[in-house]
Amino acid sequence: MRQFVVLVGLPGSGKTAYQQKKSKWAVVSRDVIRQSIFGHTYEPAVEDAVERIFSTAVIEAAESSADTVCVDDLNLLRNERSAYVELARITGREPVAVVFPYDPVDELYRLVQHQLEELKASSTRLHVSAFPRDRFDAMLRCYQAVHPDEGFVRILKEDALPIVSGITAPEPVPRKERKRRQEKQHPIPLFAG
């Protein structure tokens, strides 16, 4: 059956890195909308427009022919997730939640800060907003754990924070240089007499 995957987790917990490994998924992400359309990681002045674009894109993706649709967002609140469960059912999809770790909190916050620094260093056109600890802590306080009675067919749990974040590219693996065999070449006798 076609799936509607809802990623659930704090910033830096590995949601984007997870979905980037799923190349055939149709993914809708507020972060991608903010960055690609508005050139910001977060800007309150454009959040209404981000929300309208995001909501439309989620509905379009759910109605598409894609086998798996994924919502890559925080999805920390039960009422946000219930809207996705309902949309999944209306569009004939199986709702699945993938929950990412939020502990250890200090390590997770450091990872987010590292990701933002890397993003700032790698993109000259993108305005990277600060992400203060009190905003992060407020997100943590409002987080409502995913419960089986929410209507998800499956609730999957990722156990570890990402080693490589959704922003950080893995280190390239050095390749061994191949050497060609040097064989003595003999001319082909085309006009042998």
Residue ranges and their predicted role:
Residues M1-R2, E94:
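A structure-centric signal for secondary-structure junctions around beta-strands
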Residues R2-V8, S13-T16, K21-K24, Y102-G193:
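Conserved GTP-binding G-domain of TRAFAC-class P-loop NTPases and closely related GTPase folds
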Residues S13-T68, V105-D106:
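Conserved substrate/cofactor phosphate-moiety recognition/catalytic segment
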Residues K21-K22, Y42-P44, A83-E86, L111-H114:
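Short, glycine/charged-enriched secondary-structure capping and boundary segments
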Residues R34-S36, S55-A57, A97-V99, T124-S129:
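Short, surface-exposed, polar/charged, turn-prone segments marking secondary-structure boundaries
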Residues I37, Y42, V46, E80, ...:
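Solvent-exposed, flexible loop/coil residues
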Residues V46-Y102:
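Glycine-rich phosphate-binding loop used to anchor ATP phosphates in small-molecule kinases
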